[in-house]
C-alpha cells in the first residue's frame, strides 16, 4: 500500500486508514495449503499490544467452514496482512477469540479463510460480526520509502521552516493518492480551545521526509494554506 516516494511522487491506493502499502501483483491464492497448528477458536484475555483491526467477518464461504472477511484495505494490497498472519484475534462486543488460520486467499474484493476447528457452514456463520485483528508484526514487509498508515498516526508534522502544523490523526484515500489528516490546536468562535484540521496530500511534492524514529514528518506546506 502507499508509501512516500519523493523521487517520482507516486502513491499506491488503499481503502482505509489503518494501514497502507503499494499495489502488489500477486496470485489470488495466498498461503493456501499451509497447515496451521491444530485447535479451535478459543476465548482469550491475552490481547496483543500491537493488534490492528484489518477487517470483519461478514459471511460464510462455501460449506466447509471457511469465512468471508470484508477487509479495511484492498485484498491483495493492504489485505495482505490478513493473508500473511497465521493467527487472527476476533472481537464481537465483549467476546474475544483467538484463532489459527489454516488457509486464506483473496476472493473478489474480500479475503476468505479457513479457521482451525471451524468445519462446516453453520460454524462459519456463527462467526459473522466479529471484527478481525492481526498483530502489527505480522504485516508483510514494505519496500524502502513505503509506510503503513497505522505507523503514521500520531506523528508530528512540521514544515521546512520547522513550523509545527499538528499531528497526523488519520488518512484518507481519494482514489488517486493518500491524504494526511493533520489536527492542530485552535480557538473556537466562542474563544474556547478546540482543534482544527488541515489536509495534506501524501505525495512527494509535499511530503519531504518521514522519520518514524523521530516521529516526525517534514512537508512543504505553509500554516496558512
Swiss-Prot record:
Q: Which gene encodes it?
A: rimM
Domain (PRC barrel) spans 144-225
Function field:
An accessory protein needed during the final step in the assembly of 30S ribosomal subunit, possibly for assembly of the head region. Essential for efficient processing of 16S rRNA. May be needed both before and after RbfA during the maturation of 16S rRNA. It has affinity for free ribosomal 30S subunits but not for 70S ribosomes.
What's noted about domains in the record? The PRC barrel domain binds ribosomal protein uS19.
* Entries under SUPFAM superfamilies matching the protein: PRC-barrel domain, Translation proteins
Q: Name one GO cellular component term.
A: cytoplasm
Q: Which Pfam families match?
A: PRC_RimM (PF24986), RimM (PF01782)
**A Gene Ontology biological process annotation?**
rRNA processing
Q: Where in the cell is it found?
A: Cytoplasm
NCBIfam families (alphabetical): 16S_RimM
Source taxonomy: Bacteria, Pseudomonadati, Pseudomonadota, Betaproteobacteria, Burkholderiales
Record-given protein name = Ribosome maturation factor RimM
UniProt keyword terms in alphabetical order: Chaperone, Cytoplasm, Ribosome biogenesis, rRNA processing
Organism of origin is: Burkholderia orbicola (strain MC0-3)
Amino acid at each position: 500500500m502507499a508509501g512516500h516516494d519523493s523521487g517520482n511522487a507516486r502513491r499506491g491506493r488503499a481503502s482505509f486508514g489503518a494501514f497502507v502499502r503499494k499495489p502488489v501483483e500477486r496470485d489470488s491464492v495466498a498461503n493456501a495449503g499451509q497447515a496451521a497448528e491444530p485447535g479451535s477458536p478459543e476465548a482469550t484475555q491475552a490481547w496483543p499490544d500491537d493488534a490492528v483491526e484489518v477487517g470483519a467477518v461478514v459471511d460464510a464461504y462455501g460449506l466447509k467452514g471457511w469465512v468471508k472477511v470484508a477487509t479495511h484495505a484492498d485484498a491483495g494490497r493492504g489485505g495482505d496482512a490478513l493473508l500473511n498472519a497465521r493467527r487472527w484475534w476476533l472481537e464481537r462486543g465483549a467476546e474475544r477469540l483467538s484463532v489459527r488460520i489454516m488457509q486464506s486467499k483473496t476472493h473478489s474484493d474480500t479475503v476468505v479463510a479457513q479457521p482451525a476447528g471451524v468445519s462446516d457452514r453453520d460454524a462459519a456463520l456463527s462467526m459473522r460480526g466479529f471484527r478481525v485483528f492481526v498483530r502489527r508484526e505480522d504485516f508483510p514487509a514494505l519496500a524502502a520509502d513505503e509506510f503503513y498508515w497505522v505507523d503514521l498516526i500520531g506523528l508530528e508534522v512540521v514544515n521546512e521552516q520547522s513550523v509545527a502544523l499538528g499531528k497526523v490523526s488519520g488518512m484518507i484515500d481519494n482514489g488517486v493518492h493518500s491524504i494526511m489528516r493533520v489536527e492542530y490546536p485552535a480557538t473556537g468562535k466562542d474563544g474556547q480551545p478546540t482543534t482544527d484540521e488541515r489536509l495534506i496530500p501524501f505525495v512527494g511534492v509535499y511530503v519531504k521526509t518521514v522519520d518514524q524514529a523521530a516521529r516526525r514528518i517534514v512537508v512543504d506546506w505553509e500554516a496558512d494554506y
